[in-house]
Each structure stands twice: as structure tokens, then as C-alpha cells.
């Protein structure tokens, strides 16, 4: 499963003042056609700077899990927060607008928590810009494709004045991909709430070959591309 989040933070002595979810981007991240959904998040920081981030549903689940792990003595207090309910609401949303609203509510809950949590390294790391954010900021589809040798599609659903607007898709076709039913994979990334394969993690369907999956789209693969763009 793709992830935009990485360890460590340079945002010391800073905190998030506000965040808004602008829309969704979908990337095909494996040669079997697995599609990952990323929420585009606009964040305003305490120094008035603005960052545009891209986080998946799995990233949101990991954020909640890492908060619990970072403060084991406060598990009971964290359990009373609406974080888990927020994840379930996002997972159960059946339309784009509702899903975007639920993601925004969850993030507002996180940054509104006591400073002990909202300004912790876990939260600051989540909101720090990753190489994936840099790549998607430039809409450089061709920079992503070489890692997978697979079709890459970016489609955006952006919100404007309360409505969803579906923008034109950009599609890059790799003819080396064989045709056939193997390309039709119903991969629901929202089945994975926590990275440790917890209670919401679905098992691979019978007959699926785990080795057939391509390495996830992550910051490790995108670091070289960030350098290319900046050059």
C-alpha cells in the first residue's frame, strides 16, 4: 500500500493552524492495476506558510495508531477521542463529498487536540511535506512511471463552492502490460486501517500470488524524482 508519510520532522517549534481537504487524486501504483487514493490537503502553519499535502486512507490510520503507540499511558484518553469513529466514517462514506468532509473533520480533530498530542513529533511528521507531495505538486506523471513500468493515471476530483468537479484525466499507457483478467483487480485500500494488519485488514484472496504485487509507491522510490524536479 502506498504511503506518503516518512519518519522524522524538521518542523520543530511549529504547529498546524488549520487544514482543508481540497480533493482526491487516484494513482495506479502497480502493474496489476492497484489504485491508491490520495486526499489533497491544504495546511496552514503557525508561521503562516501553506503546504499542500497528499495522504492516503492508510496514512490516516497509521497516524491514529502511532499516536496511541507514542502515548501508551494515555490510551484510555485517546480512546475517548473521535479518531476511530472518524476513520470508520471515512471508510463508510459512499460519495466523494462526504468522504472529503469526513477526512477534514478527522484532521481538524487531530490539530485541535491538546498540544501534547497536536504538536507531537507524530503529528508534525504526518503534516510534513514528502517527496510524493513534491512530485504530485508538479503533476509529473512521467517521473512516477519508471518505477513501475505500468499505466499511470491521475484523475482529480476537486471541490469548488461546495460542488465536486471531475477534471480531465491524464493517462500514460505502457504497452508492455499484458491484456487479460489479471489487470482487473478490485483492490480496496480502505480495508487497511493500520499498518500492522489489524482488525480491519483484509486477507489476500485465495489464489492471489503475493509476489505478483509491485513494490508500493512510497517516498523511498520518489526521492530521486524529487531531486530531478528541483534540478
From Swiss-Prot:
GO terms for molecular function: phosphatidylinositol binding. PANTHER family: PX DOMAIN-CONTAINING PROTEIN 1. Transmembrane segments: none annotated. Residues 1-134 form the PX domain. The gene is Pxdc1. Pfam families: PX. This is PX domain-containing protein 1.
Amino acid at each position: 500500500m502506498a504511503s506518503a508519510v516518512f519518519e522524522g520532522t524538521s518542523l520543530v517549534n511549529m504547529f498546524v493552524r488549520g487544514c482543508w481537504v481540497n480533493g482526491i487524486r487516484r494513482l495506479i501504483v502497480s502493474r496489476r492495476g492497484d489504485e491508491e487514493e490520495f486526499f489533497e490537503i491544504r495546511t496552514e502553519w503557525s508561521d503562516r506558510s501553506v503546504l499542500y499535502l497528499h495522504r492516503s486512507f492508510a496514512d490516516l490510520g497509521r497516524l491514529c495508531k502511532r499516536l496511541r503507540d507514542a502515548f501508551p499511558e494515555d490510551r484510555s484518553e485517546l480512546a475517548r477521542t473521535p479518531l476511530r469513529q472518524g476513520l470508520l466514517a471515512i471508510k463508510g462514506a459512499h460519495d466523494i463529498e462526504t468522504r472529503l468532509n469526513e477526512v477534514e473533520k478527522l484532521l481538524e480533530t487531530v490539530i485541535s487536540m491538546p498540544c501534547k498530542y497536536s504538536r507531537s513529533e507524530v503529528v508534525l511528521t504526518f503534516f510534513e511535506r514528502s517527496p510524493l507531495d513534491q512530485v504530485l505538486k508538479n503533476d509529473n506523471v512521467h517521473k512516477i512511471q519508471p518505477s513501475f513500468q505500468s499505466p499511470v493515471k491521475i484523475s482529480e476530483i476537486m471541490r469548488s463552492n461546495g460542488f465536486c468537479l471531475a477534471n480531465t484525466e491524464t493517462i500514460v499507457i505502457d504497452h508492455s502490460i499484458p491484456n487479460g483478467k489479471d489487470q482487473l483487480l478490485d483492490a480496496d485500500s480502505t480495508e487497511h486501517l493500520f499498518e500492522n494488519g489489524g482488525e480491519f485488514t483484509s486477507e489476500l484472496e485465495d489464489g492471489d500470488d503475493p509476489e505478483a504485487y509491485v513494490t508500493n509507491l512510497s517516498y523511498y522510490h520518489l526521492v530521486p524524482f524529487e531531486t530531478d524536479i528541483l534540478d
